[in-house]
């Protein structure tokens, strides 16, 4: 039984690619066999973990490198801010599109969620891609972790797209090359954890009653804003400067 998580590093051991005083970058590649076994998409997963003393600039540089490596050459980038703008723990993508500087190279889109608009995020993104024809789509979303200490501190980049809502069991149509016809890279941060995970971390037994209860930290407003600031700067550094 695997934990409920969006973080590949919590399902398979990776290799440490780079380590600084306050950050650690871990790379994981899931092949077809791994993907089937773990229920995740094939591809490369880059995780940059930061401790409490990490400098934002240090994080930005490491994430920008990961974005450039997974995206390849991109003259036009569509940044898609996924999530519900009315829920703090789910508004990471929306905040990133608010903070990022758009222009000739970077375009931003906030499709919101089906429960708010009545339209699938995929349909909105597909329609915009058909018009502006980006070289790469970068999808930004809040993630779920199976480890409390990674909340707001572990940034994950995936080379093969994202399934919106997967971390909380609300799977939507996947955003990837196969569905959109364009390269899709995702970046996100875990901002929620299941209560059952916390109980198990504290030595308790798995409780089915807790399997649907999702918990966020009390300082979630600060965390989501800081993470959005870091990601928006990393995107600008990767694709503009």
Segments (PLM) and residue ranges:
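N-terminal amphipathic/basic leader segments beginning at the initiator methionine
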Residues: 1-43
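A structural signal for small-residue-enriched, beta-sheet-centric alpha/beta enzyme cores
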Residues: 109-110, 139-241
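N-terminal charge/polar-biased segments
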Residues: 1-12, 55, 65, 69, ...
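Conserved active-site and cofactor/substrate-binding residues in soluble primary-metabolism enzymes
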Residues: 43, 58, 62, 91, ...
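Glycine-rich phosphate/diphosphate-binding loop of Rossmann-like nucleotide-binding domains
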Residues: 80, 84-108
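Catalytic-core regions of hydrolytic enzymes
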Residues: 109-137, 142-143
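Short glycine/serine/threonine-rich phosphate/pyrophosphate-binding segments
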Residues: 87-91, 119, 146
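An N-terminal, well-structured beta->alpha segment
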Residues: 34-71
